[in-house]
Amino acid sequence: MTLKINLQKSVAEMLVLSILNNGTMYGYQLIQELEAQSKGLFSIKEGTLYPMLYRLIDNNMVSFEKKLVGKRRTRVYYNITEDGKEYLQQILKSYQDMVQGVANVLVKNGQSIHIVTE
């Protein structure tokens, strides 16, 4: 169970940082973009996203800026930092190594996986 939770957390962080690497977004926009880009295979709830963003902010991986929207409403925009970009590259490398290791074991034991990308 712990492995699954840690894996989900790492993958979610990787995907959020990857999206932010392409530009600044506010929380709800991140949720929508993740679901759209994954074609509905990944969805994240606000109760998961915001604690993750706060953790990333605390670790200097993400910064934020509050902007006034309309006359009274404030929206918080999130942006990946240089530390966040470096961390994203580390996560991507670890994820790539893990996927390669899984594929190696599956192929060695007569199974295979088929990954389709656009």
Kindly give the residue locations of the regions a language model identified:
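Basic amphipathic alpha-helical segments that dock to polyanions
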Residues: 49-56
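Intrinsically disordered, low-complexity serine/threonine- and proline-rich regulatory segments
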Residues: 1-10, 91
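Basic, amphipathic "hinge/linker" alpha-helix immediately C-terminal to the N-terminal HTH DNA-binding motif
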Residues: 70-92
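Amphipathic alpha-helical dimerization/coiled-coil segments
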Residues: 86-118
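Short beta-strand "wing" residues that participate in macromolecule-binding interfaces
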Residues: 64
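N-terminal helix-turn-helix DNA-binding core of bacterial DNA-binding proteins
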Residues: 6-48
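Glycine-centered, phosphate/nucleic-acid-interacting loop/turn motifs that mediate DNA/RNA or nucleotide
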Residues: 60
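Short, solvent-exposed loop/turn elements at beta->coil junctions and helix N-caps
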Residues: 4, 67-69
